[in-house]
Amino acid sequence: MSSKVEQLRAQLNERILVLDGGMGTMIQSYRLHEEDFRGERFADWPCDLKGNNDLLVLSKPEVIAAIHNAYFEAGADIIETNTFNSTTIAMADYRMESLSAEINYAAAKLARACADEWTARTPEKPRFVAGVLGPTNRTASISPDVNDPAFRNITFDQLVAAYRESTKALVEGGADLILIETVFDTLNAKAAVFAVKEEFEALGVDLPIMISGTITDASGRTLSGQTTEAFYNSLRHAEALTFGLNCALGPDELRQYVQELSRIAECYVTAHPNAGLPNAFGEYDLDADTMAKQIREWAEAGFLNIVGGCCGTTPEHIAAMSRAVAGLLPRQLPDIPVACRLSGLEPLNIGDDSLFVNVGERTNVTGSAKFKRLIKEEKYSEALDVARQQVESGAQIIDINMDEGMLDAEAAMVRFLSLIAGEPDIARVPIMIDSSKWEVIEKGLKCIQGKGIVNSISMKEGVEAFIHHAKLLRRYGAAVVVMAFDEQGQADTRARKIEICRRAYKILTEEVGFPPEDIIFDPNIFAVATGIEEHNNYAQDFIGACEDIKRELPHALISGGVSNVSFSFRGNDPVREAIHAVFLYYAIRNGMDMGIVNAGQLAIYDDLPAELRDAVEDVILNRRDDGTERLLDLAEKYRGSKTDEAANAQQAEWRSWDVKKRLEYSLVKGITEFIEQDTEEARQQAARPIEVIEGPLMDGMNVVGDLFGEGKMFLPQVVKSARVMKQAVAYLEPFIEASKEKGSSNGKMVIATVKGDVHDIGKNIVGVVLQCNNYEIVDLGVMVPAEKILRTAREVNADLIGLSGLITPSLDEMVNVAKEMERQGFTIPLLIGGATTSKAHTAVKIEQNYSGPTVYVQNASRTVGVVAALLSDTQRDDFVARTRKEYETVRIQHARKKPRTPPVTLEAARDNDLAFDWERYTPPVAHRLGVQEVEASIETLRNYIDWTPFFMTWSLAGKYPRILEDEVVGVEAQRLFKDANDMLDKLSAEKLLNPRGVVGLFPANRVGDDIEIYRDETRTHVLTVSHHLRQQTEKVGFANYCLADFVAPKLSGKADYIGAFAVTGGLEEDALADAFEAQHDDYNKIMVKAIADRLAEAFAEYLHERVRKVYWGYAPNESLSNDELIRENYQGIRPAPGYPACPEHTEKGTIWQLLDVEKHTGMKLTESFAMWPGASVSGWYFSHPESKYFAVAQIQRDQVTDYAFRKGMSVEDVERWLAPNLGYDAD
């Protein structure tokens, strides 16, 4: 061990060390331009280089050195080289693959020089350099092509080659450690570990390795789907000095995962989170002191050995963290119990106290004729179903074997494993790669991100090959099955079994350094009852060898192919299952840890018929000489199999249940087929019809509510349950009316979308969820004035009022409703929800105007708990008190909150506008000037749909298409996706929804912060003026943007243009939704609105593409996929009034006037400038190559006054419309 490494370990044992912060964040603050990235050397490089931050070590080394020094000055002990994207793979984006080694070397050398300088200043605090290996821009375990899940655009070997080149340069440049960071795909990281170890061996060095992964969102998983512990298990073989987490999340969100890692990691733990989560404008709001306070709590809890920062963090953050952890004890390395720690997407730990582990055997071409046929016929989808069935039947590992003479075993193994990676319900378990061919094994290992098992290696080809293979397996990070097989052949007696296993164990642990807990012995299971006397003791020999191995070879595990033992009875499944059950009963008692079995055909020992169990035990334990004959005689009695009729009867079993259970089943499963029939049967059994609702129907809905609350049902299922409930209630209503009875409920709530707002999807979902929990909902619809809400609440004697809104003017209307409730003496709770609402706005603006309980509800899933607490005699007072205390804290924090960046005057902001050289740029001439109506069919638009927000509407979190394979919500997401596409088919075929729109292109020029729009090319007659706002916070390295900056100034003499558009998913949206509501079908009511919303957005995307390629025509050859369109990989923008770049809603009126929108489309604006129908989009078109989306964010009084003057509005009106953007207190 080098003195540097010894120093580092000594420091880690004494205190919490500090890593640096965000490199990209700091580079951005330097406001570098294209020429800065190029320098002299790359002045003529054939592609743009701005954004290639790693190149700056060659073209602007003084900037990188200054950042390193700033972090050292802030207290960092370790700095990271500026090489996050320096592999040949990532550098290919800039055609700089050949410079990868040079950049890595220069970066390490630069960081080394800075570290040495600071160490010389304070020798008692040595500084270290971590050579960074980033994740690359490719994923080895995820297909980039949704249509080909087995496809990969990078291989393990390509990653290894790239990482080796980078590692060599980093080491030679002077790095003290290698940091493999921001791991979002564990297979990439396994390739990095493999490469680093290989290169260390070639260079004759052994530096410490640091590993840091990324939990991407609230699911608690990496991008490639692994949990924290699965991720750790997969890379534990690296024997890293540190293991940690970074990026994607802030301290609040990351805490639980760092805590989990601290619990399971035998090594030191690191964390370098982001400065909170990015806000709606992509900025990081968590200030240094707040972040440091959170990090200190982590340190006090004993989670940390090293801490630093990632995105959004600066030297200020690192300095605050350094002070926060100073003097606190570092995390002590825990004493972790010895266990074989495997992983798929989830961990599987096999220790001394573990139960028997089932290894699924049916994905083996040598053992399953069906699976072999499917693979040979390349029916991989059906082959995946075989694997899925094994996992669903209880297999904790699946064994995969492709060794068949007529198969390309390597290709079949790679394809099947690649497909499994895209099936979370299969990939959650570890993989056992089973082959007698080393080449197949190695190909398979390069495909799995988890820690799997190789089945198998042995000493049959001699010790040299055995050691060579074992070392490679260790480097790949796999556990290994070792067959009891040596140069003399397979062990068939108890003595030979332990002799070979003992010898292999000694070689593996002493010569190879293989962890004993990752050694799994297979002492050979052979068939019994063959009629050959020498075979009679085979089972007993195996069972005895299990006892020997456990006694002599500490921590080693034992496995075996269980079906081998019953091979003599193939074709007689009941007897084979009995043999397996008895064999396992005794083998497990003697130490067998796992077995390759058909997980769907495991009998229970105690459930076997006594005569069959006794006869099988005679054979397994070799208790009688005539055991084989007796079992053969008995076997025919038990031959047989389940019939299709029996299977069908079992499938329809629920229809034979009593009516109460049938109703519950229909409600939970969302089945409407039998609901009237079963409801009638329940009515016949009840004394009064109301009892059916209050009894079995509500009992069933309570089950639905419980399952939803526990996360075992998802919103689309709940809405389907509500549809079943409503149909049952509708059936009963005439009978209830006749009896003049009314049912009881848990409470009554009036809900409404406030005046001026037409959006109601979220409100509808909340209503359905509450109805599922026996609350009576009075839904007043959309655009409801305050007086109607309050009048209805009094008339129906409501227990609560709920307000919803999507557009920012709705926030003011909610304040108005609260004031009216106070004036009229209401005391019932007021609930606030909707896309633009927030806890902060509720606390600061709404709650203070109403003395009754006022509660912000973030989403539908939280509504039930809030409503239940507010209406509970025992919980209400405490809940209200806690909420009020929380909101008071929010108000205090809001009052104290200072902007992350200070405001500037409007004059200063204008001086820092987009400094564009208009002399060197000629704006493209629009091909089709004027206003045109446009239509697009649903079939055209469905190709432009961004499905991710659709799933968000239904509270299913995840990005499309990955959400369809999500382990938690994937099955429901698939059902929902199918229903949505079925609805699209219906809407299209029957022309029930007809998207329409209008577009216009006009001559235009900038005048100050406004845009004059002209009637024609003479530019003498101004049709209208589009007014815009400018960013008004201090921008270091960036312009203070205003949308007008993207249009040529009038004084430049350049002729420029602007476009405007308005589109809707269809005027028929509300009528369709109302029709479904009349049928008591909330599910399809919400579905049609959600689809109309997606069609409107798709229409906006489609029309923008047509504008770029045809109407304006500045990008006629553009050819982008839908994914690229969603990522906005094109020139130009289409900002919408009411959104961050132009947040003032009344500008929609300018578009309506300019395009005569209502005449051409039927679309309307409400008094709050909400668009009707709700599924509508409108906005502007800009063509400028540097046009971009941005957030105006907070503005000051001088700009509000100026804007009011330009618009001809009062300052008070402008302040009302721009309330969320005011950087001052207008009151």
UniProtKB/Swiss-Prot annotation:
Cited CDD domains: methionine_synthase_B12_BD, MeTr
Cofactor(s) needed by this chain: methylcob(III)alamin; Zn(2+)
Binding site for S-adenosyl-L-methionine: D946, R1134, Y1189, F1190
Domain AdoMet activation, first and last residues per copy: 897-1227
An individual GO BP term: tetrahydrofolate metabolic process
Keyword Iron-sulfur: no
Residues that, per the record, bind methylcob(III)alamin: E694, G756, D757, V758, H759, D760, S804, T808, A860
Keyword Metal-binding found: yes
Top-rank taxon: Bacteria
Enzyme Commission number(s) of this protein: 2.1.1.13
SMART domains from the UniProt entry: B12-binding_2
Ligand binding (Zn(2+)): C247, C310, C311
Residue ranges of every copy of the B12-binding N-terminal domain listed in the record: 650-744
Domain observations: Modular enzyme with four functionally distinct domains. The isolated Hcy-binding domain catalyzes methyl transfer from free methylcobalamin to homocysteine. The Hcy-binding domain in association with the pterin-binding domain catalyzes the methylation of cob(I)alamin by methyltetrahydrofolate and the methylation of homocysteine. The B12-binding domain binds the cofactor. The AdoMet activation domain binds S-adenosyl-L-methionine. Under aerobic conditions cob(I)alamin can be converted to inactive cob(II)alamin.
Extra remark: L-homocysteine is bound via the zinc atom.
UniProt similarity note: Belongs to the vitamin-B12 dependent methionine synthase family.
Primary role: Catalyzes the transfer of a methyl group from methyl-cobalamin to homocysteine, yielding enzyme-bound cob(I)alamin and methionine. Subsequently, remethylates the cofactor using methyltetrahydrofolate.
Protein name (database record): Methionine synthase
Gene: metH
